[in-house]
Amino acid sequence: MSSTEEMSSVKNTTQVIGVDPSSTVRVTIVQSSTVYNDTPATLDKAEKFIVEAASKGAKLVLFPEAFIGGYPRGFRFGLAVGVHNEEGRDEFRNYHASAIKVPGPEVERLAELAGKNNVHLVMGAIEKDGYTLYCTALFFSPQGQFLGKHRKVMPTSLERCIWGQGDGSTIPVYDTPIGKIGAAICWENRMPLYRTALYAKGIEIYCAPTADYSLEWQASMIHIAVEGGCFVLSAHQFCKRREFPEHPDYLFNDIVDTKEHDPTVSGGGSVIISPLGKVLAGPNYESEGLVTADLDLGDIARAKLYFDVVGHYSKPDIFNLTVNEHPKKPVTFMTKVEKAEDESNK
């Protein structure tokens, strides 16, 4: 229907719940824009779309990258090599204010929305941990539980100046009654080893919130669906110039930057693809709205008859991936008891 200090080998450690391969699951992508500099209003907007998707039978709802907090396309933050300025500092202060703490009140509200509407929810958000920001995907269950998060491990280009880098401790794949759900954010999808880690954890519904609406992106999504033998859901914002806050110093490529002209700044392209490489819904480049498809879960087994990238088509005697899932912290504090135990073990 249209409209992931100790090193460990990659393995699927999720609890097996089991999915009926004969079942069909309806999933929905929300293609819409952030309300910039207004996180409460963005949450209100998200609620509207979640309610609408659930009313149409969706069991999983996916939002775009950085939907809460906003994807700062064209923002400069006063950045230039060897240059620092007050305007950039103020711009970052405002952006930081729009980000959310995880856990926090906004996360609680999202969990409540997922539970009230009986949906699995995957939400793109800008997370603040102290004064470092992360581009994060948040996962919620239909029982109203916050399951956990994935922090983008490698921001792209100038994103690295405003977002921190996630570590291997937040690369989850959740085993749910509708399938194993995980996420790769934007150009993480171009990292073969990251994708392989998700495949090894058994991902079946591969969520790809993104800020890339190029034609090449569509080709990547089809490739990943076929490579991983999984359903791929790619969510992108659709945003017009008028929806950005007033600012004299945005840099938008190939468009006339005036609110009167009101060009499209983020061009959509949300799409749903089957494990066999078939486009089930989208891409939508025209407007905000819902992109919905019914997933035949039996297609996963059908696809893996001939190609299982971490199973019968792998070659572990030659190629092997190791993933460090230990949290990386800049400072570790040891109590006197821990120090004594450490000394006694030497």
Swiss-Prot record:
This is Nitrilase 3. InterPro entries: C-N_Hydrolase, C-N_Hydrolase_sf, Nitrilase/CN_hydratase_CS, Nitrilases_CHs. It comes from Arabidopsis thaliana (Mouse-ear cress). The lineage of its organism: Eukaryota, Viridiplantae, Streptophyta, Embryophyta, Tracheophyta. Pfam families: CN_hydrolase (PF00795). GO terms for biological process: cellular response to sulfate starvation; glucosinolate catabolic process. It is found in: Cell membrane. The modification N-acetylserine is found at S2. One of its GO terms (cellular component) is cytosol. Residues 25-297 form the CN hydrolase domain. It comes from the Eukaryota. Its EC number is 3.5.5.1. Keywords: Acetylation, Cell membrane, Hydrolase, Membrane. Can convert indole-3-acetonitrile to the plant hormone indole-3-acetic acid. The keyword Cell membrane applies. GO terms for molecular function: indole-3-acetonitrile nitrilase activity; indole-3-acetonitrile nitrile hydratase activity; mRNA binding; nitrilase activity. It is a peripheral membrane protein.
